[in-house]
Amino acid sequence: MQTAITARDFFAAKLQFETDPSDLAADRASATPPLVIDVRSDAAWSQGRIPGAVHVPNAELAERASSVAPDLNAPIAVYCWGPGCNGSTRGALTLASLGYTNVKEVIGGFEYWAREGLAVVSDTGRSRQAPDPLTAPVA
């Protein structure tokens, strides 16, 4: 059975379940920062990640979720590579299916986090690239 939904309701609901890199950076500085989960492969994790993120590949997420995130109501942000990757959607669905109530997908993923000039960590150290003018707000 199809239920009608207004455009307003659709977009309001959508914003409840997604965040972007800039908003995630601001949320991480708040009093209740989200747990950030990287669901990419080991190789991708080694290449670069959001500082402070926890690495739980999608294939392991259902099994490890309760040890990584014991509070079902805590804020969680899930990311993968970028806009062409649906790993964060699958990860967020896994968590929601397990009963987590405050899960958001990071739209743009790691790619847009880095392109916005936010700090990244890799196995070789910490870095920050100049913001890409096509993705980062001009000051």
What are these language model-derived features?
Residues 56-65:
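Glycine-rich, highly charged phosphate/nucleotide-binding loops
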Residues 28, 49, 65, 117:
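Short, flexible helix/strand-to-coil boundary loops that buttress conserved ligand/catalytic motifs
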Residues 65-113:
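Catalytic cysteine-centered active loop of the rhodanese-like fold, especially the PTP/DSP P-loop
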Residues 54, 72, 119-124:
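Short, hinge-like loop/turn segments at secondary-structure boundaries
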Residues 36, 53-55, 103-105:
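Conserved beta-strand scaffold positions in the cores of enzyme catalytic domains, especially
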Residues 1-47, 122-139:
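Flexible, polar/low-complexity N-terminal or interdomain linker segments that lie immediately upstream
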Residues 45-51, 113:
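Short loop/helix-cap segments at secondary-structure boundaries that form the rim of catalytic
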